[in-house]
Amino acid sequence: MVDDYTAKMTELIELMRLIGNDTQQCEVKECKRKISSTITDTLSAFSNGSGGWIILGLSEKNGFTPVEGFDARAMQEALSQACEKMTPVVRPVIVTCPFEGANLVFARIDEMLPRDKPCFTTALGPHG
């Protein structure tokens, strides 16, 4: 049985494979050895916009295929830590989902309430 998160992630990957790139609602990051340096930009954009999905461990340049050697557990923790570096703190749903023999990290970032915006990287400030 496939859970709802795995089904949604698979649906998004199939769409991105068809169109050849990630979308305004879904950002893909390889993150083989460490979390992407632009992850806080993505968290901010989705939190201040209309929300979105993040998939870690997937290679856009290799046709949206799983990254060999990706450590889902470590990257799930790194993503959680990145969320803590935001003001206000981003509280996504983060799950590990199976896909084509690998585990990927899948996160849903909700739009923040108007009173909580702007969401920004704490160290950079609201105009960073």
Regions found by a protein language model. Name each.
Residues 1-128:
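Conserved N-terminal catalytic/coupling substructures associated with nucleotide/phosphate chemistry
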